[in-house]
Structures are given as C-alpha cells and as structure tokens.
Amino acid sequence: MTYVVNDECVKCKYTDCVDVCPVDCFYEGEFMLVINPDECIDCGVCVPDCPIDAIKPESPELIEWVERAKDFIENKGWKNITKKKPALPDADKFKDEKNKFNKYINNMN
C-alpha cells in the first residue's frame, strides 16, 4: 500500500509534505508532486502537512494516481524532491479548482 497525491495538487504544488517524508519518496513535475509507490513506506506522516488535502491512502478509486506517478517518474523523468520550496505563484488561485489534471496536465502529454 502507498499514499498518492491527487488532483488537488495540480497547479498548486505546496511542498510542506516533502520536508516530513522520512524516505524522500516525493517527485516533482512542473505543476504537481507525486509519491513514488515503490519507495513510500505507508507511514502517512505527510498527510496532515498537505495544506490542501491532496494526499490520500491508496484505494481502488485512486489506483489511476498510482499508475500516473509511476509513469511520470519512469517515463517522463520527474526528479526526486527532498526539500520544501515555495508553492507555485498562483497556488492560492487554483487550490479550490476541481478536475485540474485533465485541464492542465493530461492535455500536455
């Protein structure tokens, strides 16, 4: 089992979660973070640190996010992030928007 970063992170990319992860399993793309499911130890320590509630435990309805994370890391070259950095400049503007992945990322692939 792993934790996943979902649609809420898109266009926000708050990185509070990165600082608390004991195994450095977060990876970043231009508009969001993902958790490497092969590195996550399922501790959940990152969950309360996400200010927009974008981190959830793996479940059948979130399996697509596990697959996306693997694809972004293995095929798109997303790099490991181990230190907190500022959120995206318009994060507050996008934090309440829904279905951001299909609108901003899926169309780029």
Curated annotation (Swiss-Prot):
Reported cofactor(s): [4Fe-4S] cluster; [3Fe-4S] cluster
Domain 4Fe-4S ferredoxin-type: 2-30, 31-60
Coiled coil ranges: none
UniProt keywords, alphabetically: 3Fe-4S, 4Fe-4S, Electron transport, Iron, Iron-sulfur, Metal-binding, Repeat, Transport
Superkingdom, taxonomy of origin: Bacteria
SUPFAM superfamilies in UniProt: 4Fe-4S ferredoxins
An example molecular function term from Gene Ontology annotations: 3 iron, 4 sulfur cluster binding
Residues where [3Fe-4S] cluster binds: 9, 17, 50
Binding site for [4Fe-4S] cluster: 21, 40, 43, 46
One Pfam family recorded for the sequence: Fer4
Record's keyword annotation contains Repeat: yes
Cofactor details (free text): Binds 1 [4Fe-4S] cluster. Binds 1 [3Fe-4S] cluster.
Function: Ferredoxins are iron-sulfur proteins that transfer electrons in a wide variety of metabolic reactions.
PANTHER family membership: FERREDOXIN, OXIDOREDUCTASE
Name of this protein: Ferredoxin
Originating gene: fdxA
